[in-house]
């Protein structure tokens, strides 16, 4: 999710439904992304969620633009503290999710759905099929498992690489 979508979301329910602010109004119909909030994220959300509104409240009472700059600056500090040499941005999480999901063989259409991308421009079959919440939930769960247990997926990733590159 983009930061603006996170800040506008009511997190009181276990199932999250939202339309990306970035694409709202650009399509004939705003696509709604639906998935179950993973327990790992729920713990963090509960720490920062205003119980009355369901929105996250970090105690920062300035404009969204200023808050966005503050988050970007803070991510830079965090990366430095963790000895990460690359530039870390809020968008890095979206890119990492997509990369990890692809590495473990999650279909592009499901990755697109989880990221809130339109799936109508990528072939005829996508006009006839629809990603379901359960598929998104499974993909998110599998990516979390991969991040926490990369060795578990090592053999699969190597086999997949061999197949994709037609190595024998």
PLM regions: where:
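C-terminal catalytic core of tyrosine-transesterase DNA break-rejoin enzymes
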Residues: 77, 81, 92-117
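Catalytic-site neighborhood detector that most strongly recognizes the C-terminal catalytic loop/helix
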Residues: 22-24, 115-149
């Amino acid at each position: 999710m983009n930061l603006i979508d996170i800040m506008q979301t009511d997190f009181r329910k276990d199932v999250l439904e939202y339309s990306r602010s970035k694409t709202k109004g650009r399509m004939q119909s705003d696509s709604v992304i639906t998935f179950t909030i993973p327990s790992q994220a729920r713990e963090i959300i509960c720490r920062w969620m205003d119980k009355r509104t369901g929105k996250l409240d970090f105690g920062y009472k300035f404009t969204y633009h200023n808050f966005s700059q503050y988050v970007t600056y803070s991510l830079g500090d965090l990366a430095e503290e963790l000895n990460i040499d690359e530039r870390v941005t809020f968008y890095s999480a979206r890119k990492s999710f997509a990369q990890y999901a692809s590495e473990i063989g999650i279909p592009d259409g499901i990755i697109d759905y989880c990221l809130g991308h339109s799936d109508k421009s990528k072939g005829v079959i996508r006009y006839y099929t629809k990603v379901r919440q359960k598929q998104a939930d499974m993909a998110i769960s599998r990516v979390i498992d991969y991040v926490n247990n990369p060795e578990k997926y090592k053999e699969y990733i190597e086999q997949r690489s061999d197949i994709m590159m037609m190595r024998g």
